[in-house]
A protein has these predicted regions:
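Intrinsically disordered, low-complexity, charged/polar segments
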Residues: 43-64
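Short, compositionally biased
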Residues: 28-39
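N-terminal acidic leader/helix
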Residues: 2-26
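Short, surface-exposed beta-strand/loop "edge" segments at domain boundaries and coil↔beta transitions
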Residues: 23-26, 40-47
Length: 64
């Protein structure tokens, strides 16, 4: 999924995951797109600081 596809899916309230179902991709209450590992709450931004480059490969993001 591209960044635009991920953001659209989240806006449509779809469950987006990265790599496996343990990594949830979502938008927080202040508008940041994040990836959180559910088991330990470790969280990173969806993108690098430039806001364009994904923290992961496009093919590893999917809708659950």
């Amino acid at each position: 999924m591209t960044l635009a596809e991920i953001q659209k899916a989240i806006t449509e309230n779809k469950e987006v995951r990265w790599m496996n179902d343990g990594y949830k991709v979502y938008q927080d209450s202040i508008g940041q797109y994040l990836i959180t590992f559910i088991e330990n709450d470790y969280t990173i931004g969806l993108t690098h600081q430039n806001g364009l480059t994904l923290n992961g490969n496009e093919q590893d993001f999917y809708i659950k």
